[in-house]
Each structure stands twice: as C-alpha cells, then as structure tokens.
C-alpha cells in the first residue's frame, strides 16, 4: 500500500499509462497526480471482475432498498495468506454496502483469519494457505434467528486477478487509441463496456 503514490508519481513523470489494483495509498493525492498529469489509468480496489460485479450489485441494492436488512445482525469472516497484515479492502467495501442496507456493523468487527488451523477449518485448501487465497463470508441473521442470508466469495490463487488485469490493460489501450476524453477508469467502467476476455 505504501508504494501506490510513489509509483503513480513515477508513471506520471514518465508519461506511462498504467493499471493499478489496490486499496492502499492516499486516494486524494492519487487523484491529484492523475489530474495534473492527464495520464490514462485504470485504478480499482479489486481486479477480480466477478467480485467487482458483486460489489456493484450490492451498492445498487443499497441505493434501491435502503434499510432492507435493518435489525439483522452480521458476521464477517475473511481469510488471506498469513503475510497479509491488513483487513481486506473488499470486505470493508462490502460491509459499507451492507451498512447501506440497514446493518449496524463496523469494519473493526471483521474476523481476520491468518493462522493455518483457522483457515483450514474455514475451508481454505491446504495448497493455497500460503500461495494466495481470499475467502470471505458475510452472514446476515434476522432478529429472531429464523432467517439467515449468507454471501460468499472464495478465491484460490491469483488467476482471476490476472485475468481482470489483462482485461484492464486491453480496455485502457482501446481508450487511448480512441482518444477518450475520460482518462481515469475503474473496473466498473470495464464491466459496463463489456470489455471482457
């Protein structure tokens, strides 16, 4: 996360369009760097296309149905390889969507699994404990416990992020070639354009 802004500044100085998938850095400074340079870029907190689509759907649901899950409780558990020290940006973003749907939940309540024993019990395959995984479960329970909703997105490896990154590069190239007035894009822009391989 600490390399986000210095890297963007280097790209801007050299005039190199770029794709960056991160939840880190100073977003306001990043926006200023891009605006000042006029550089083309795709910046997204998540490069997994389907995960971005899920987040977009929940964001829209929060706009369309505010308070739909008022009174429900929520439990969020996320697991990543032990080298990840911070809370998942994707989990934080989805919690924000659920808050819009009426759930009272703070991101500090997200349960982080970084130890192998807990990860295995959570369903992470042995082969992906240290080589890369992102498992998330959001459980919503009605006040009387009679209704439970569960949302999950589990990723083993890095392929889905690599595929999204390739799509982002191809999309960015097409926007540059077309002389697009818009210079900074997100994965949502790519999904809306149907620019998927």
Describe each model-derived feature in a short phrase.
Residues 1-4, 165:
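Generic low-polarity alpha-helical segments
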Residues 2, 24, 48, 81-84, ...:
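Short, surface-exposed acidic/glycine-rich loop or hinge patches that mediate macromolecular interfaces
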Residues 3-64:
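Rossmann-fold NAD(P)-binding glycine/threonine-rich loop
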Residues 13-14, 36, 67-68, 101, ...:
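Alpha-helix C-cap/termination motif
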Residues 30-34, 66-68, 137-141:
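Short hydrophobic/aromatic-rich motifs at helix boundaries and adjacent loops
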Residues 37-93, 97:
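Rossmann-fold dinucleotide-binding core
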Residues 70-197:
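C-terminal substrate-binding/catalytic lobe of Rossmann-fold NAD(P)-dependent oxidoreductases
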């Amino acid at each position: 996360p600490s390399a986000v802004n210095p890297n963007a500044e280097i790209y801007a100085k050299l005039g190199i369009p770029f794709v960056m998938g991160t939840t880190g850095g100073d977003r306001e400074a990043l926006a200023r760097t891009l605006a000042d340079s006029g550089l083309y870029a795709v910046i997204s907190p998540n490069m997994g296309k389907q995960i971005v689509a899920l987040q977009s759907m929940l964001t829209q649901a929060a706009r369309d149905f505010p308070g739909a899950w008022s009174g429900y409780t929520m439990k969020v558990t996320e697991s990543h390889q032990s080298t990840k020290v911070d809370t998942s940006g994707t989990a934080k973003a989805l919690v924000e969507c659920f808050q819009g749907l009426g759930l009272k939940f703070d991101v500090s309540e997200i349960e982080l699994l970084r130890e192998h024993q807990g990860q295995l019990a959570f369903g992470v395959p042995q082969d992906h404990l240290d080589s890369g995984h992102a498992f998330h479960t959001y459980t919503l329970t009605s006040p009387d416990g009679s209704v439970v909703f569960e949302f999950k997105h589990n990723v083993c490896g890095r392929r889905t992020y690599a595929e999204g990154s390739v799509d982002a590069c191809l999309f960015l190239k097409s926007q540059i070639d077309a002389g697009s007035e818009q210079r900074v894009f997100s994965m949502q822009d790519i999904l809306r354009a149907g620019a998927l391989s």
